[in-house]
A protein has these predicted regions:
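Canonical AAA+ ATPase core
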Residues: 2-3, 7-10, 15-120, 161-163
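C-terminal engagement/docking regions of AAA+ P-loop ATPases
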Residues: 132, 137-220
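Short conserved motifs of the RecA-like P-loop NTPase core
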Residues: 108-115, 128-130, 134-140
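Short, surface-exposed acidic/glycine-rich loop or hinge patches that mediate macromolecular interfaces
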Residues: 1, 41, 66-67, 151, ...
């Protein structure tokens, strides 16, 4: 959200059309094409709010919390000096984080293969109907001004299949939907003025909708 609106418009074209336009020329982006972005929800000075159309094109929006005590200790350990990297104009202290981009964890072929495996994960008709029900509930809830678009359902199915594969399954289960609903849905909905005035939060409203759906059964 620190990018200017013109830059955000260019990114929207890349995310939606998988291409970029420079002047009168248009260039197709290589595949697979992924966008990972960070946003500071607290510091708003010098930022530009992302339009709903652009937020909707992010499959997931994961909200980070403060690290635990053990995690923070590990961060400090990894950030300790690992020597000095000499450059033409001097030198800088190196940390383990500086070496992340030098440690490849997979290849282009590995990513394509994983994408193919995700598409083979089975989604039952019952699961699909529950996804549609949840998305529709966001459009009918009295506290929500802007409900989720059909892209939310598409993203929830994709994310559920990926989660199933990560957990060693070739089919989705209800736990996938409940585990991913917040990351897939929250950034796509907007509470109305009355709900905000009452101090309600999107996560609370979403939990109400999930609780009201009852048990999800059937994986075949």
């Amino acid at each position: 959200n620190r990018a200017a609106p013109k830059v955000q418009g260019a990114l929207l074209e890349a995310m939606q059309e998988h291409r970029v336009t420079i002047g009168k020329e248009t260039f197709s982006l290589p595949a697979p094409f992924l966008v990972i972005a960070t946003q500071n929800p607290v510091e708003q000075a010098g930022t530009f709010e992302l339009p709903e159309a652009q937020l909707d094109r992010f499959m997931l929006c994961h909200r980070l919390q403060y690290p635990t005590r053990d995690q923070e200790c590990e961060v400090l350990r990894r950030n300790m000096d690992l020597g000095v990297a000499r450059q033409e104009q001097g030198a800088i202290a190196r940390t383990e984080f500086d070496m992340i981009d030098q440690q490849a964890v997979g290849s282009h072929e590995d990513l394509v293969e994983a994408m193919e495996q995700v598409h083979q994960v089975h989604v039952s008709e019952t699961f699909l109907e529950h996804v549609v029900e949840l998305v529709n509930r966001t459009r009918q809830h009295p506290a929500i001004e802007l409900g989720a678009s059909p892209r939310a359902g598409i993203s929830l199915i994709k994310a559920s299949r990926a989660r199933a594969l990560i957990h060693g399954r070739d089919y989705v289960i209800p736990e996938d939907l409940y585990a991913l609903a917040e990351d897939v849905i929250l950034h796509r909905i907007r509470l109305n003025y009355e709900a905000l005035a009452d101090g309600r939060r999107g996560a609370e409203v979403l939990q109400e909708m999930l609780s009201g759906m009852g048990a999800i059964t059937g994986t075949s």
